[in-house]
Amino acid sequence: MTGHKGLALAWAMVVCLLLGHNAYLWLGQRIVPDTDILALLPVQERDPVLQQSFSHMVDAAQQRVIVLVGAPDWAGAQRAADAYGAVLASRPGLLEQAKLDGQAESDWLAPFQAHRLALLTAQQERDLRDQPPAFWTGNALARLYSAFAGPKLGAFRDDPFGLFGGWVQERAQETPVRPRDGRLFVADAERQYVLLPLTLAAPAFSMAAQEAVLPLLGRAAAAARQAAPGVQVISAGVVLHAAAASSQASGEVETIGLGSLAGIVLLTWFTFHSLKPIGLVLLSIGIGFLGSLSVCWLLFGRVHLLTLVFGASLIGVAQDYGMYFLCNRLAADPACDSARLLKRLLPSLGLTLLAAVIGYLGLAFTPFPGLRHMAVFSAVGLVFAWLTVVCWFPLLVGGGALRSGRLARVYGAALARWPRFRIGRAALAVLAAFAVLAGFGWSRLTADDDIRSLQTPPPQLVSDQLKLGKLLDAPTPVQYFLVRGASSEAVLQREEALKHRLDPLVAARAISGYQALSNWVPSARTQAERRVLVESRLLGEGGPLTQLGKAIGEDAAWSAATRAHLLAPQAPLTAEEFLSTPPSEPWRHLWLGQVGSVHASIVALRGLDYAALPLLRHAGDGIEGVQWVDKVGEISSVLGRYRQYMGWAVLAAYALVFALLLPRYRGRAWRVLAPTALASIATLAVLGLTAQPLQLFHVLALMLLLGVGVDYGIFMQEQPDRRHAAPWLAVGLSAANTILSFGLLGLSRTPALHAFGLTMLIGTALVWLAVPCFTAETNESAHAPATTD
Amino acid sequence: MKRIFSALTAAALLCASAHAAAPIARIQAMLAKPDVMCGRFDQTKHLAGMNKPLASSGRFCVVAGKGVLWRTLKPFPNTLRLTRDEIVHFEGDRVAMRLDAKQEPTVRMINSVLFSLLSGDLAQLESLFEVEGSADAVGWKVALKARAPALAKAIGAIALDGGAYVRNIHIGEASGDRTDIVFADIKTGEAALLPEEAALF
């Protein structure tokens, strides 16, 4: 007993250290778990240029909230937008409103005018190559005399063939948004809208931001609706989705969480006539969690949110250790010393710990850092929780501290009548039927790793998003091309090669258009080619310009002067020069510039038809330095690979655990594992039969199921004599608690939680029911085994 | 005339501006503002760097609630139709160019300004221009100056004069190009619209 006191004291010191370290981490360092799911990729697969392109496209998009305030007339829309903005301004520092720069409007064209000969649309370039001189003369004459032939900027002699005007018009059509009265303006057939681009000051996934932003936007929209008749407010942003998801989740936490808590409290009360056991079990799990966090942080210097959440669930197995001890304490003679009781239980407790740790460590042999962290996290957590049980529980729970409740007695009695699995004709028939059913279920099992199927946004958000996408014709931030080259010139040239491939896709309506810096700044090579093209096809002696002069009665001097005016020497427009001008503002995010030793840029796609994704994926094939990026696909594929690796890890864990059990149980080792294996097979079959596609979260649950199932198997095999109710009670309590805490998540409407919970619900229930069937038969009339008091 | 369209398109792509009032009620009272109005136009352009002016002529129609038809007959026949949601340029029966509001949201704004210009709807024009005018017993004169710097730079100065209808439009651009349009033979009512013109609306 004194020896045990020393042990408990030593452990108390360790726990104090843990508490101190955790307080330092959370309060002092203010650590924040990683949330970028791509940080879970193997290190060698991470690519700094790709990461930077994500941060340009996705991270910026995550912080954006786009609001359109529309009314049937422009004045009404402006009033409503003012009312909207006034409400936002009442809470400064939450959402920043972009200011429109008046200077940018007036000098919009200036940077391009000096380079107009090199700025042509693709159609103009084709016409220059294919059309006869008469086409151009006729065209210029028609433009001279007709009332309207497209926009003309500056004097006629600056652009006699309307090439620059056509180019400007094409550029203007890259976005339907127009500055108007110092605001941004878009319109559809019913309404005129003021566009309000807002930037969220706090991270979109922070709960505080979500809680503050949503009511503010709601009040602003109400104010806008009051300001003018017929007002429509359309808003979209990642924060809105995040807020919808967390409000759904927190609503469920309230109902499901309260339900499961109430269930566990009642269960414990009726079993032990005391709530102390829950407190003790939570204490062990809590110390386990803090311990793994400390160790992981010391080892890796970071923790991913996914590791935290999954790892914490895997530590849930640790309740079995506490329950096992408490149930045995309940069944044992009150006179028996708790420390001696523990000594007796130690082999089986040790074995359960070892089995779970070895099972989880299988995850460490996958190439994914996320799974490795998870393995370390959960294994360390189990060890800490186990040590808490071993060091503290005997002192905290003395003999006679627990009394058996009525529920425990009724339940314990049920064991005696439980069927037992005996190899024979009936058992084979049952097995065969099971195999057929399971085989049928498995044959219908499919997998779905699409990240989008993990979200269920409210329909209002989806419809707003669609309307907004239609009105703004904005590019998708998650699918684009990444272009790299040794210099900015190389990048621009590769962009141009890519655009040649994309043009047929625009014609086929797979996309409505693309945004690229080379739309504004052609490569120097292209600029030179175009100048030569224009000079030779339009400005040559006897060419369209001379003929135009003749047609309007001007002499050769006019043609010569106009030619000289047009051909005035120009240095090519460079990307750097363009980027320093105000008109480049909306396009700067496309240019990554120099990243390490390469230059890179983004070609963004507008009006993407998702059915055409396979076509787009291969559109850049064969062009050096061009890479298709699909963040949705990327995340989905990470999830898919995690699912597969984890599946193998589960299988490997079964093998390892079996090897571990073999020395102690020999011929009975299979009896420990069989209930869990059968339950897992049956659970997968149920998923197949109910047409639920397999996800990472199902496989994760199977891993956890192995952890708890093996515990139940070991408890029952340690004392196979059916007259001993303690293990059966421990199994029942553990399983019921597991079902209440994890299984009830199956009621969640959040797909990931639903998948995880449902698997745990079916699996745990099946293991619980099956585990007594597989206990070895003992001669129950013989002496009680030496291991019982 | 082309200057107006061109400059407006260009400018509208970039910006637009609004509001204030001018003492133009008298001019407004003089204008007839019929539902349908057709007539003849003669346009003369003086382009920078050219010795000879470019002359063209044709017919125009302004139909309230529908839009504007601008038919150049000499020296090259072609027709321009501006309705609420699009601008269409015909060469004979062939559509040479079509710009609709879906592609270019400022089309509606351009068309409304043009309609106002031809019908002399000064109240409407005030949203984009500073309007300065004078009127006597027989007629009125108005000078328009764009409120937004970009628009002013693209269009330059516009001057209108007339009586019951707009008679002259003069546009002087910053680039040095000048355009004069004279309207004549103005008829009103449904009968003013020729059958081929009615068919185009």
Model-derived features: positions:
Chain B
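N-terminal leader/targeting segments and the immediate start of mature chains
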Residues: 19-40, 46-51, 197-201
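Gly/Pro-enriched, hydrophobic low-complexity segments
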Residues: 122-201
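Bacterial N-terminal signal peptides
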Residues: 6-16
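Amphipathic hydrophobic-ligand
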Residues: 52-59
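Positively charged n-region of N-terminal signal peptides that target proteins for export
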Residues: 1-4
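An acidic-aromatic
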Residues: 59-109, 179, 185
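Flexible, surface-exposed loop/linker segments and immediately adjacent secondary-structure boundaries
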Residues: 94-141
